[in-house]
Amino acid sequence: MQSEISLGRRVKKFLPVTIAAVTIGCAGMDTGEMLKTTVQGIAGTGPYSNQNVVATYYVTKQHVHIATRKLGKGMVAAVTALGIKNDVDVPQFITDAKVANGSDALTAKAQKENTEIMNFSKKASKAIAKKLDKPFTLSAAAKKELAAAMRLVRMGQILNSRAASGGILMAQRIATRDPMQDLKQAASANPAVFAVSMINNILEAPTDIKNFTDNFKKVTAGFDKIKETESTKDVEVAKKEALEKEVDKETETAISKDMKSMRG
């Protein structure tokens, strides 16, 4: 009963933040998905069940990282299917790297590449919008490629929604817990985690996540218009439930090991 009361107080305290962050971070998500992700974030269930601030930070950054990779792969597939790949500069590492790899989410290399992916995706989105302005036809192979693109971007949207919830939860836990104490607890289980400089990253994380999800929303909102185009109406994509399960499966390995090692 006490935990329910405590949860209720936390929900009330952070409700305005919750609404803002989820509205920004869930482009392309339906109401049911947004509600599910928001409740998971506030209650600390699902991928955020660990109450350690450091672990919450790490898993949220992993969601950001993998969402970005999904988006990049999806955009490459989209411009390829639409025959406009030569109109944009595609970073080579997007096609070389594994799309779901959360283990290097905090590295400088990964963050640099993620910035490149988002910049490429913005340009690709503009090129796609220009292509959609005029009627066009697609071969069977191109439709298959476009379906793959839509599927990848959709998975990125799911992960982006989860990252938005992670940002909400970060703000809550920073306000109610001692990040330095959590960092020390995490270090006791995994000495490599301990770095005083990480505290600044943790304190800035809620704002950083909000900025990321806002940016992601702008890119994917334009991409979603592909589904409204006459030439692409018959493109098949996987069902939402199947994508949710695939996202869970792909991220579980990347997240669970680190969550366990940081549990204080």
Explain the meaning of each model-derived region.
Residues 110-264:
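Extended amphipathic alpha-helical interaction segments
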Residues 2-15:
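Bacterial N-terminal signal peptides that target proteins for export
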Residues 16, 76, 80, 84, ...:
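Generic surface-pattern signal
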